[in-house]
Amino acid sequence: MAQLYYKYGTMNSGKTIEILKVAHNYEEQGKPVVIMTSALDTRDGFGIVSSRIGMRREAIPISNDMDIFTFIAQLEEKPYCVLIDESQFLSKQNVYDLARVVDELNVPVMAFGLKNDFQNNLFEGSKHLLLLADKIDEIKTICQYCSKKATMVLRIENGKPVYEGDQIQIGGNETYIPVCRKHYFNPEI
């Protein structure tokens, strides 16, 4: 029976490389998958999932008003798995569509993304995945300053920590860093 998986981690925890690994494992056995990502994330191009170690693949971009359920249901070949990158940017309706893919089409969905933003608020997509997912797993990484488990994301602008501003600002290593709680409140900058 298919399930909805939510795998979250801070920046630089290996979420995208995990997607690419899972896709490779399915495809190596001749089982097609669908890789999707938020249309908001254009760091490496529109509709591209890209890991920090250099691996990348094309993906289907998801807009907030996309009917994901209908898109998957109308594919000529039923996928063995749907893999979602940057799931924190999904809308509530996107997440409910993913649950329908699992429940009505019996296709497993694995959604990967951040849980909380730089202000320690849940993203809309993360909130609804936490509510609806059958299985929730944390992908761990370490604090940039002390090597404890990183649980938060620190936004850095002009060499200084930022705790206010727009929730969504697409960036990479130069803007966001994984930190533990202690170094979120007292970064060693």
From Swiss-Prot:
GO MF annotation: an example: thymidine kinase activity
Domain of life: Bacteria
InterPro entries: P-loop_NTPase, Thymidine_kinase, Thymidine_kinase_CS
SUPFAM superfamilies: Glucocorticoid receptor-like (DNA-binding domain), P-loop containing nucleoside triphosphate hydrolases
Binding site for Zn(2+): 143, 146, 180, 183
GO biological process: DNA biosynthetic process; thymidine metabolic process
Cell location: Cytoplasm
Enzyme type, top EC level: transferase
Keywords of this entry: ATP-binding, Cytoplasm, DNA synthesis, Kinase, Metal-binding, Nucleotide-binding, Transferase, Zinc
Catalytic function, reaction form: thymidine + ATP = dTMP + ADP + H(+)
Active site: 86
E.C. number: 2.7.1.21
Entry-linked Gene3D superfamilies: 3.30.60.20, P-loop containing nucleotide triphosphate hydrolases (3.40.50.300)
Residues at which ATP binds: 9-16, 85-88
Main location: cytoplasm
GO annotations of cellular component type: cytosol
Subunit description: Homotetramer.
Family: Belongs to the thymidine kinase family.
Protein name in the entry: Thymidine kinase
Organism: Streptococcus pyogenes serotype M3 (strain ATCC BAA-595 / MGAS315)
